[in-house]
Amino acid sequence: MKNILVTGGTGFIGSHTVVSLLKSGHQVVILDNLCNSSINILPRLKTITGQEIPFYQGDIRDREILRRIFAENRIDSVIHFAGLKAVGESVAEPMKYYDNNVSGSLVLAEEMARAGVFSIVFSSSATVYGDPGKVPYTEDMPLGDTTSPYGTSKSMVERILTDIQKADPRWSMILLRYFNPIGAHESGLIGEQPNGIPNNLLPYICQVASGRLPQLSVFGGDYPTPDGTGMRDYIHVMDLAEGHVAAMQAKSNVAGTHLLNLGSGRASSVLEIIRAFEAASGLTIPYEVKPRRAGDLACFYADPSYTKAQIGWQTQRDLAQMMEDSWRWVSNNPNGYDD
């Protein structure tokens, strides 16, 4: 059993990972500034897990609160989700993203070292591959040219953590590059909070389904794919959460930098996602095909074989379950955690 600090632990992926950690017998402390989440998730996490979870409201750039957390809790490892994640916003406000995502991660690493904690699992992204020109994506591909400050911030943090580990071999840096997380916890109690216009496909579909938006915009119908729409590797958020736990358990005591893809190894198109959601919900999702967005790729997906060999993890939940769990969450919580 380990005591894990989860930064961004009330966010979408962070909250589901908290559930997985507790289910696996670990203890958890959450740090979150609630800029993209809700305090109302905490009683729901208690309902799911049966445990009161220590929570600190604060920012990873705040050294004082980090020092207080490390002084008051015997932390063994950190799973680091805290960061801004809207691609479009990052293009408009790059300084905000580099300050939060890059400077924040550096402050966190410095305070971990000060406290004698040398194990971190970092929430990275497949965006660090850029456009390598071939699929599937494998961990030995070089870092690519990212298409947004969001993606660049993830790539920069990967480089920073890798350099820190080279200089100080006590560190275990676990860099998890994940693809497109969707779905929700099977209880319907936690899921993705619908704040504003969604950046990702499934939350957009869910807002149309719940009547918050009139129709779905499908960007690009002329890609070189079977139905002309973009294809992505979708992964159930609980599979993703379990991947974080598996990586932490397998590698947190193994010094080095560990790069791992977290994906299913399968690509699904936008129209396939729409049809799967319609099948799960019994609804019809109106959509309009619009021009491609700049920087969007036709198709990408993970090669998950290295990850399976390293930590014994692979996805368990199929597209139908992703849709069923998403629809349960949305239909039970049309306003997210504000109900």
Curated annotation (Swiss-Prot):
GO terms for biological process: galactose metabolic process. It holds the Pfam family Epimerase. GO terms for cellular component: cytosol. Gene3D superfamilies: NAD(P)-binding Rossmann-like Domain, UDP-galactose 4-epimerase, domain 1. Keywords: Carbohydrate metabolism, Galactose metabolism, Isomerase, NAD. Its EC number is 5.1.3.2. The active site is at residue 150. NAD(+) binds at residues 12-13, 32-37, 59-60, 81-85, 100, 125, 150, 154, 179. One of its GO terms (molecular function) is UDP-glucose 4-epimerase activity. It catalyses: UDP-alpha-D-glucose = UDP-alpha-D-galactose. InterPro entries: Epimerase_deHydtase (IPR001509), NAD(P)-bd_dom_sf (IPR036291), UDP_G4E (IPR005886). Pathway: Carbohydrate metabolism; galactose metabolism. The keyword NAD applies. CDD domains: UDP_G4E_1_SDR_e. SUPFAM superfamilies: NAD(P)-binding Rossmann-fold domains. Belongs to the NAD(P)-dependent epimerase/dehydratase family. NCBIfam families: galE (TIGR01179), PRK10675.1 (NF007956). Involved in the metabolism of galactose. Plays an essential role in the incorporation of galactose into meningococcal lipopolysaccharide surface molecules, which are important for pathogenesis. Catalyzes the conversion of UDP-galactose (UDP-Gal) to UDP-glucose (UDP-Glc) through a mechanism involving the transient reduction of NAD. Homodimer. This is UDP-glucose 4-epimerase.
